[in-house]
Every structure is written in C-alpha cells, then in structure tokens.
Amino acid sequence: MSESAVKAAVAVAAEHGLRSDDPVVLRDAWHVLVHLRPLPIVARVSSGLPYPDGPPEDDVIRELAVASYAARAGAAVVPPSDLLDPGPHRHGGHVIAFWKYVGQPREVEPVAAGEALRAIHEALADYEGELPTLHTDDLVAITDRLEPSPDVEFLRELGIRQPGGQAQALHGDAHLANCLPGPLWHDFETACRGPREFDLAALALSDEVRDDEPSRIALEAYGYHDADLLEECLPVYAAWIYASFMVALPRRPELGPVLDERLRWLRANYA
C-alpha cells in the first residue's frame, strides 16, 4: 500500500514541477503520510480506509478550508502547502492532499496541546463554511456497508444521537495522535459542526479506555467545559470510531482484539 501511495504522491508533485528524489513514509495507517524529501511538503494519501475508493473529495476540500481558516486566524495547525495546489488530487486510485512539512514527529507536550485545542475552537467559532453535523451521516454510511449484527446496530443507535450544546466548527477527531510537537494540530478531514465537548470526547475516550495520562492532562489544560455534555458526547464519538475500526478489520486484523475490548467497555457503560 505505502509503495503505491509514495508513487502517487511523487507523480502528482512532479506534474507541478516539484521533484522528490528521496520520499519517506512517515506513517501508514488510516492515511499514508509521505515526506517528499528534500521538499518541505508532506503528502497525505488515502489508504482506502474506510473508503475503498479514497475519501470523498468534498471531505478533503472541507479539511483544507477549515485548516486554512484556522491557520489564517493564528491557530496552531499544520497549514496546507503553499508550494503547489494543495488538492485534492486523484492519482492511481488515491486521493492526495499536500501539507507543509513541520518536522519529524516527536512526543507532544499535552498541556500545550490542550491549550492549543481551545485556541483552535476560538478561531473556528465564526467559521461559516458548510460542515456536517457531527459524524452522523458518516456513521450511517459506514454501518450500511457492514454486515448486520447486534454490535453494528448498537453502534448505529449510539452514533446517531444528537447531543445538545452550542454548535460550531470542530476538528472532529481531536485525539493526541492528531497533534504534532509545537503543538500543531492536523488531520481536519473529519471536521464537523457540534458542541466543543464533542472534540473533547476524543481526549476523554483515550483516558477512559486506555488510562492515557497525556490525554487526561490535555483535557485538564483545555480548561472549562460542560462535564455533563462531554459525557453525552463521548458514546456518540466512540460509536463512530469503533464503527470505523470494523471497516478497517480486513486490512488491519490486529484491531480485532482491541475492538472486542472497546465494545465490551462501551456496552458496560452506555447500553
């Protein structure tokens, strides 16, 4: 998979007059991240998960728009590349977007990450671009593709709930793996509209199911939030995440035991 992604990224860059002689894969998971060395550009290339044909181009367009808006407001986000059209581009069955290279991944300082997430929310508070409401439509589309089962139905019922609170533009998947040192938040592909506590649910979920101290610290550093609304948002976010895990299982069978454990936890707390 990563070899195909690298070839696609290098080819599109070359079409724009930019040559990468030494590309290197930074990450191969939901997306393949390719540093197009020696260029200060990272290509994010669709891996086929959860969409075998790549994510809808509208999702990538929304991501670039939201990240660009936050960057112009001075928020701590990875900006799109300004050396070529950031995309989205299609090549060899992949969907590709180009971003500024900000250095090698290192451990993120959680206090700074939490504070930066609040600043992003402040920057996006007046964003008026079209965004989906939470991940409701995405969850329905994902569960429609899965073989019917009690687990799938359970996730669907949880995930279509609509928490209260004041809605605004959100990151959409604000766990610490989507924050680079700096800190710089990235991966706005699932940007959506909802209460800020929906973003905080990603940090709370990592704390709850993995006893992840950095996530707990980041949540504390974020500052004031509605704890009851966060508790309302958490299972809605978790249902979307675990439905995505189900789609990924054919390519990433190692997720199977993790998914089973997470579903038991979700049923024990929210069934």
PLM features: residue spans?
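A conserved alpha-helical element in kinase catalytic cores
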Residues: 2, 6-9, 44-92, 108-120
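An alpha-helical support segment within catalytic cores of ATP-dependent transferases
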Residues: 4-10, 125-172, 269
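ATP/Mg2+ or Mg2+-diphosphate-binding catalytic cores
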Residues: 47, 133-141, 145, 213, ...
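ATP-binding glycine-rich phosphate-binding loop
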Residues: 16-37
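Active-site activation/catalytic loop segments of kinase-like enzymes and analogous catalytic loops
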Residues: 197-226, 236-253
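Conserved kinase catalytic-core helix
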Residues: 102-132
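Conserved short submotifs of the Hanks-type protein kinase catalytic core
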Residues: 92-104
